[in-house]
A protein has these predicted regions:
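Bacterial Sec-dependent N-terminal signal peptides
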Residues: 13-43
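Beta-strand-rich domains and repeat architectures in extracellular enzymes and scaffolds
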Residues: 61-142
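A short beta-strand motif characteristic of beta-propeller blades
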Residues: 97-110, 163-185, 252-257, 308-321, ...
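Blade-loop segments of beta-propeller domains
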Residues: 101-122, 133-137, 142-152, 156-196
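Structural signature of eukaryotic scaffold interfaces centered on beta-propeller domains
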Residues: 109-126, 187-198, 259-275, 324, ...
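Structural motif
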Residues: 139-149, 210-218, 285-299, 346-358, ...
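Short loop/turn segments immediately following beta-strands, especially the blade-tip
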Residues: 150-157, 214-238, 291-309, 414-418
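Loop/turn-rich, solvent-exposed surfaces of beta-rich toroidal or solenoidal domains
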Residues: 279-281, 286-293, 308-363, 368-376
Length: 418
């Protein structure tokens, strides 16, 4: 970079830090004066990353359990429909780009005991479902992680009804202090930062391990009525408990991925249905010296993740002084383009420092759009051409903004971001 361009780059960065973006078009402007600083800026097949064979952990499920699928789940909570989702703090999507959205019920949109993270969806017996992952927080952290199954079909008799389902795994902790742990299954303590759906299975990002797998046809009903909500596992008399959750979704296996592709902060299947893509979350401040990357792992029609033709992309983002895409919370891949849900930008736009960033392989920068405060993962619903996301924070989490509503799930018209 010559002296004149260096001065221009410094001035532009200072301007971004001191000025609030006030229009969508301004936020989409690309400063391409800075050169690419990595040699890998397009989809590149790499070596060194190893997907170990699928580790089947499902033997603990051969104990006389009765399995259910999503259509058989009793949904006991109701989301808020209409335009109420636009009332959350920092919701800055232009009206012409909005498709639809929902808000959680009062308990779920304000709790600090659980944090929503990943999102995906599927159709079963003509009914559209969204599925959201959460991790347990604060005094509930020992409960691990859960998913939420939401009916979003307007013609369905359970429209906007939803149910929380606890995630479990077979490794029994050696000692616990917060609850009574029985045999057979235990909570799954992961961040659950992203989730992808493929052929009735869920693939959930596991930060340092790789990818955990769950079969949606193997939901198990629990014994409820435990007023303490502090029992988990199969008791000596055969009763099943999960902190008073009515259902669990047990892990059936996992993929241990080695070679430095971690942290596995988010995950999503590409539009072509041939690859699972994961992104690394690194903040632009505390982790400024680390280069965030995204990886593509081929998936067979059987649902097996393959240890071949693994791809690497290092997306650019000129909002950060090092031109790297920090703060990646979610991603979606279509063709040679990747859409990134990013937080922690050094500039603010209508109450939010999040951006939806579109990166095309080989380009020196992303195209950026306004994106709501606290935005997390991405999911593409191809039948309707919707790009879904969700926001994480409960009211006044992180910022004392006076808002009583922060959390929502929303969809935008994907064509407006292509």
């Amino acid at each position: 970079m010559n002296y004149r361009l260096s001065i221009y780059f410094i001035i532009s960065i200072l301007f971004q830090n001191c000025t609030q973006v006030t229009t969508e078009s301004a936020d989409n402007d690309i400063d391409q004066s800075g050169p690419p600083i990595d040699t890998i800026d397009s989809s590149t097949t790499i070596s060194g990353i190893t997907v170990n064979g699928f580790i089947d952990t499902s033997s603990y499920l051969n104990s006389g359990f009765t399995f259910l699928n999503p259509t058989q789940i009793n949904k006991n909570r109701e989301a808020i429909g209409g335009d109420s989702y636009t009332e959350v703090y920092g919701f800055n999507i232009p009206e012409e780009n909005r498709a639809r959205g929902i808000r959680w019920n009062g308990d779920d949109e304000t709790t600090n005991l659980w944090k929503p993270q990943g999102i995906t969806g599927f159709v079963r017996d003509g009914v559209r479902y969204l599925l959201v992952t959460w991790y347990a927080n604060n005094s509930s952290d020992y409960k691990g992680s859960r998913i939420t199954l939401i009916d979003i079909s307007p013609s369905s008799n359970t429209y906007l009804k939803y149910r929380h389902i606890l995630l479990t795994q077979p490794t029994i902790p050696t000692s616990v202090s917060n609850y009574t742990q029985y045999n057979t299954f235990a909570p799954l303590d992961i961040h659950a930062g992203g989730v992808a759906y493929f052929n009735h299975k869920l693939y959930i990002a596991s930060t340092n391990l790789g990818i955990r797998v769950f079969d949606l046809n193997k939901i198990i009903e629990m014994k409820t009525g435990d007023t303490t909500a502090n029992l988990c596992g199969k008791s000596d008399n055969g009763d099943l408990y999960a902190f008073n959750y009515r259902y669990i979704l047990p892990q059936t296996g996992y993929y241990d991925i080695n070679g430095g592709a971690n942290p596995f902060s988010s995950i999503q299947i590409n539009a072509e249905g041939t690859e699972l893509w994961t992104a690394q979350y690194y903040a632009g401040s505390a982790d400024a010296s680390i280069v965030p990357k995204i990886y593509g792992f081929p998936i067979a029609s059987t649902g097996m993740i393959l240890n071949e033709d693994i791809k690497l992309i290092i997306p650019k983002n000129s909002l950060f002084s090092d031109y790297h895409a920090h703060g990646m919370q979610g991603l979606f891949r279509k063709g040679s383009k990747t859409w990134l849900s990013c937080t922690g930008s050094p500039s603010n736009s209508y109450g939010s420092n999040a951006r939806l960033a579109r990166y095309t392989d080989g380009e020196p920068d992303t195209v950026r759009y306004r994106w709501p405060y606290g935005a997390e993962a991405l999911y593409y619903e191809s039948e309707y051409d919707y790009l879904w996301s969700l926001t994480e924070h409960e009211p006044n989490s992180g910022y004392s903004n006076g808002s009583t509503v922060n959390r929502c799930i929303f969809a935008v018209k994907f064509a407006n971001y292509e």
